[in-house]
């Protein structure tokens, strides 16, 4: 008997990782996560059921505040029974602050919450966004979360409350 496919919820709050270049203007615009597989075809190899939620208005992470942290936590709480793991896509400026706040807001979870961002948009040919997203999805799909607390991912796995920003 085969195990069921992991169900992962991506929560896009804002940040470069969720942007794509507008070919007409060359400016960045929010990525349409309905086309995630088209832009990151490697995700097919993961064999996960992936859904997403996008903030109605993506937040520049330098403007994120406790109300946004509550919104992220609420999305996780409302979807906790439906999914096996959660990936929060976030701007890198304040990702460490959000990760730390969520580690206290979401104590004692039995499912992984992974927070990641990137320096380059997800749709670029050579980007840390693709690697960070795929790594975050793989960790979120693990059946044995790391101490049940949120983690930040950017090539290195860090416990959320141990992260810091160089701002």
Stretches with model-predicted labels:
Residues 156-163:
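Conserved small/polar residues in nucleotide/adenosyl-binding loops
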Residues 13-15, 91-92, 118-121:
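Short, ordered loop/turn segments at secondary-structure junctions
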């Amino acid at each position: 008997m085969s195990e069921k496919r992991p169900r992962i919820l991506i929560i896009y709050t804002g940040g470069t990782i969720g942007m794509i270049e507008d070919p007409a203007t060359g400016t960045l615009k929010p990525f349409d996560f309905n086309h995630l597989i088209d832009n990151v075809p490697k995700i097919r190899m993961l064999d996960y059921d992936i859904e997403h939620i996008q903030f109605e208005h993506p937040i520049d992470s330098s403007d994120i505040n406790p109300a946004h942290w509550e919104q992220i936590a609420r999305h996780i709480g409302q979807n906790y029974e439906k999914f096996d793991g959660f990936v929060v896509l976030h701007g890198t400026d304040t990702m460490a602050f959000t990760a730390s706040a969520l580690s206290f807001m979401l104590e004692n979870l039995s499912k992984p919450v992974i927070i990641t961002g990137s320096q380059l948009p997800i749709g670029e040919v050579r980007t840390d966004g693709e690697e960070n997203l795929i790594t975050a999805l793989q960790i979120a799909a693990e059946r044995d979360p790391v101490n049940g607390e949120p983690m930040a991912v950017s090539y290195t796995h860090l416990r959320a409350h141990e992260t810091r920003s160089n701002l």
